[in-house]
Amino acid sequence: MIKRKKIALIGAGNIGGMIAYLIRLKNLGDVVLLDVNDGIAKGKALDMAESSPVGKYNGEILGTNNYADIEGADAIVVTAGITRKPGMSREDLINTNVNIIKEVADNIGKYAPNAFVVVVTNPLDVMVFAMHKYSKLSSNMVVGMAGILDSARFSYFIAKELNVSVDNVNSLVLGGHGDLMLPLVKYSSVAGISIADLIKIDLITQDKVDAIIERTRKGGEEIVSLLKIGSAYYAPAESALLMIDSYLNDRRLILPCSVYLKGEYGVSNLFVGVPVIIGRNGVEKIIELELTEQEKNIFDNSVKLIKNLVSNV
């Protein structure tokens, strides 16, 4: 009998709960849903378990507040932490969330040192840096989810502007998860046609593209301002799940993720969003793209901000 994969979700809020549901929907493995609020984790787990006879979901789901229950997990997604409220930046969350990540990292190092860890907690590039530092896990096994989400937003806005299927759109966003992210227009396309060529044939204007880039950078803030009492969770959950799926099933997808750089893009000892191949060994390859001078300046400014934010972590 093939042993089922064990996936631990640290944080049973909106994102953690949604990931748990998607794991069961796609039958990726058994789930441990952990939260300091024991009732939330157990309540959501029981609710999902009771849906099994209707949805015909196989696999176990456990709600808990005991880190010992994540022992031997194959993959872990960390969403624990406070979320943004209207008017807050991701950076406003640093002090509180770093302390939360320290505790989570210590327990992952203790109970699941061989797991592939995806960090979702904001500010993302700082939290994944802290996770790597305090968990002592290998850098290829600790990644941050941001670029997939940012790229998805960029793709969606392009598709809506052109009134075409989102299936036709491929895009790529690099850099930090914030206002200095770098949507790469030259590496983005619609049905294989570059955005630059679409501008040339007047299917979209440069002004529209620029507006979409800015909306992408403010994508999370837009949702926070609408929700009032929370932040995005459907798209972040789908994005994190794609990373876990690529790892557990060795799909070797090329995905933009926040990863530890060792000289790539002229950056060392920081986690920054770049395209990578994720397979059964975690981050298997970092893909270095050629950037224009303008793109490099934006990327470097994003890196400077990340470097400043992690200086006291």
Swiss-Prot record:
The entry lists its GO molecular-function terms as:
L-lactate dehydrogenase activity; L-malate dehydrogenase (NAD+) activity
Q: State its Enzyme Commission number(s).
A: 1.1.1.37
Q: Does the keyword Transcription apply?
A: no
Record carries keyword NAD: yes
Spell out the SUPFAM superfamilies in the cross-references: LDH C-terminal domain-like (SSF56327), NAD(P)-binding Rossmann-fold domains (SSF51735)
Q: Name one GO biological process term.
A: lactate metabolic process
Summarize the protein's role: Catalyzes the reversible oxidation of malate to oxaloacetate.
**Similarity comment:** Belongs to the LDH/MDH superfamily. MDH type 3 family.
Q: For this UniProt record, give its keywords in alphabetical order, as a comma-separated list.
A: NAD, Oxidoreductase, Tricarboxylic acid cycle
Q: Where is the active site?
A: 177
> Which residues are noted in the entry as NAD(+)-binding?
11-16, 35, 97, 120-122
Q: Which reaction does it catalyse?
A: (S)-malate + NAD(+) = oxaloacetate + NADH + H(+)
Instruction: State which gene encodes it.
Output: mdh
Q: Per its UniProt entry, what is the enzyme's top EC class, as one word?
A: oxidoreductase
Instruction: Give the protein's recorded name.
Output: Malate dehydrogenase
Binding of substrate, residues:
84, 90, 122, 153
